[in-house]
Amino acid sequence: MAHACLQQVGLKSRSLQIAGSLSHGDKRRLEIAIVLASSAEVILLDEPMAGMSVENVPELVEIIRSLARTHHKTVLIVEHHMDVVLGLADRIAVLNFGELLICDTPEKVIANPTVQNAYLGEVL
């Protein structure tokens, strides 16, 4: 099972490496492989794109998308990069100092004037 999970995230060829010797992006993939091996139905990913090089983000987005769809997992992502969130989420909750501003579809969130003013100026 471990090798199958590593293969799904593109790490099968590195299965004998020590985790500490992996690149930051590969460590993120390893974290997701560990999640795949678990029986958890709900997965929390805290800033999964943090420290990732720009060229590796799309691949990690696809791995996370696969985790949700192929493996029927609910994935809760804490992420500050709205462009990444918009590409992944079915629903988005926007918090401001612990207050829930909105929880809705990506389309409705980006159309919300409060969210546009506070968070999306550079994305839109």
Positions of predicted regions on the chain:
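Glycine-rich phosphate-binding loops of nucleotide-dependent enzymes
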Residues: 1-124
